[in-house]
Structure formats: structure tokens, C-alpha cells
Regions:
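Ferredoxin-like iron-sulfur electron-transfer modules
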Residues: 91-105, 243-261, 274-291
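Short acidic, glycine/serine/threonine-rich loops at helix termini
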Residues: 4-10, 27-28, 51-55, 72-73, ...
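Short gly/pro/ser/thr-enriched loop/turn and capping motifs at secondary-structure boundaries
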Residues: 22-23, 47-48, 66-70, 129-131, ...
């Protein structure tokens, strides 16, 4: 909203951009408002900041001018605050749609390539590996919420809707620690024979490379106990636990065939560090020869 306001008003207005909204900086707000003639609080959805500013005894405009629903844009601010439509530059060339994809060199690519090649039904989860659902891999068939990959697959296998002989759950290492353990526990407890793949890239990739219980470091980067996924799965009662490098496509396919053929629950830990980690050595580069 700050950038939108700057683009609409330019140098004709003063701006206070709040970097922290809880607690709100009373002194800073009072100081800024004392230097201007009129205060307009530009915030999306509920008037949280506006209500707080008014509680300080400061008169301001906000939701009496701006909508409480949907996202703001330059067009919305210009229409509501200046009563005019902004001029847009027409672009004659059609810009191609570029949906997000897994990073070049991402270890999850090998995993999803093997799953796609084998035409396995994949119950997905929430993480950067969710992008395995996007073209050209298009390997993920369902995604609901954190932990739902395992519990969802277990339910589908138990109900007879999807055969456990050709279906897997894919969940990341940090998401597994967050809300996947109980789902795997239920598979064992309910005598299921589902196959679960833990995509272990040694970090929490989707939200900015935060540490997690499996990395051996706290969020501050301090050394700590690293959760051993193999031992945890064994403690839950999983007898068939494999660790496979997803870049080794042949081994991944062989491991998948073996796990899917078993009449017991199986776990495959697809382990290779995220290619964006600083400590990962990039010792082999490949380019596309367009000729």
C-alpha cells in the first residue's frame, strides 16, 4: 500500500511507513501527524491502524474513503482519494504467462520426474515442492494443507478410492516435523500400507531458508540436536525406511517400485540439500544447446 500511495500522490504528500504494527509506535505517529494538515490511513481490510490512530485523539480518514474488502491498487487509491482514473500505458505485445517453477538444480525435480514417469498418484503438501504440481512436471494430484498429504493418502487408501500400490504422499522435512508425524503414526496404527516420501532438502525452502528440527541449528543459527528422520520413522513402527538421492533417477525408480509393492507402510527419504544453500558446492553445470 505504501508503494501504491507513492505512485498515486508522488511528492504531493508526506508518508509514514510502519515497519512494525504491534505494538504501534505512539510517539512516531503523533510526531508525524502533528506535521501534516490531513491524515489518511491507507490499509487493506479491517481498520486496525485507523482505529488505533483515532484512539490517540488524532482525527484521520480511512475506511470512510477506502473499501474494506479486497486488495488495493493504484487504480483503487486514485479513484477513492482523488476521484480520477489513472492513465495506463498500453502494452501492445502480449506478455507470456510465467507461472512459478522449481528452481534450476532443485533436488525435488528428480523425485517428481520419477513419480511422473511411473504415473504414480501423488498426495502433495505445503512447501516449495508443491511447485511439482506445475508444468512441465505436473506430478502432484492434490494439495490441501500442512500434513494433509499423509493423512489424506491414508484415508484414500483405506477407503479403497486409490490403490496404495500406485500412490504416495510427498511431504517436506520441516512440514513433516510440523504436522506429518501424527499422520504417519496413524498409518501404522490403522494397519495401513501407504508409502510416504519425505522430501528432505535440509532447510525450510519455501519461506526463506529457516532452520527446522532436522537441520541441527536453531533459528538463530546456534548448534542444536538434529532430529533423525530415519530413527523417528523406525520408532513409529516403519520397518521399510529408505534414503535415496533424488538426482539418482534410477535408484529412485527402483526404490519406489519396491516400496509400492510391499504389504506394509514404507517411507522413502528423498535426501539432497537445497541447491540454493551457501554450503552446497556447485561442481557441475549444464546448459541447453539450442542447436
Amino acid at each position: 500500500t505504501y508503494v501504491y500511495a507513492k505512485e498515486v500522490f508522488g511528492e504531493n504528500a508526506s508518508y509514514l511507513k510502519l515497519g512494525l504494527v504491534n505494538p504501534l509506535p505512539d510517539k512516531l505517529i503523533r510526531s508525524f501527524c502533528a506535521e501534516v494538515e490531513r491524515v489518511i490511513v491507507v490499509e487493506e481490510l479491517d481498520p486496525v491502524i485507523e482505529t488505533y490512530v483515532k484512539s490517540l485523539g488524532i482525527a484521520c480518514d480511512g475506511k470512510n474513503l477506502l473499501p474494506e474488502l479486497s486488495e488495493f491498487s493504484q487504480e483503487v487509491l486514485a479513484k477513492c482519494l482523488l476521484d480520477k482514473q489513472p492513465e495506463f500505458v498500453a502494452i501492445e505485445d502480449e506478455i507470456p504467462n510465467r507461472p512459478p517453477v522449481l528452481c534450476p538444480g532443485c533436488p525435488h525435480r528428480g523425485l517428481f520426474f520419477a513419480l511422473k514417469k511411473m504415473k504414480v498418484t501423488v498426495s502433495g503438501d505445503i512447501g516449495c515442492y508443491t511447485l511439482g504440481s506445475a508444468p512441465p512436471l505436473s506430478a502432484v494430484d492434490s494439495t490441501l494443507c500442512m500434513g494433509a498429504s499423509i493423512s489424506g493418502l491414508h484415508g484414500m487408501n483405506k477407503s479403497g478410492g486409490i490403490s496404495p500400490e500406485n500412490s504416495v504422499a510427498v511431504i517436506g522435512d520441516s512440514t513433516f516435523a510440523h504436522s506429518g508425524v501424527t499422520g504417519l503414526m496413524n498409518i501404522v496404527y490403522n494397519k495401513g500400507i501407504s508409502t510416504v516420501i519425505i522430501a528432505d532438502n535440509s532447510i525450510t525452502g519455501m519461506t526463506g531458508h529457516q532452520q527446522n528440527p532436522t537441520t541441527g541449528k536453531t533459528l538463530k543459527g546456534e548448534p542444536t540436536y538434529a532430529l533423525n528422520l530415519e530413527k523417528l520413522c523406525d520408532a513409529l513402527g516403519i520397518k521399510d525406511v529408505k534414503v535415496i538421492d533424488p538426482n539418482d533417477i534410477k535408484s529412485m525408480e527402483e526404490g519406489l517400485r519396491d516400496s509400492l509393492s510391499r504389504k506394509e507402510p514404507s517411507v522413502i527419504i528423498s535426501r539432497r540439500p537445497c541447491v540454493l544453500l551457501k554450503e552446497v558446492k556447485k561442481d557441475a553445470y549444464y546448459v541447453i544447446d539450442s542447436d
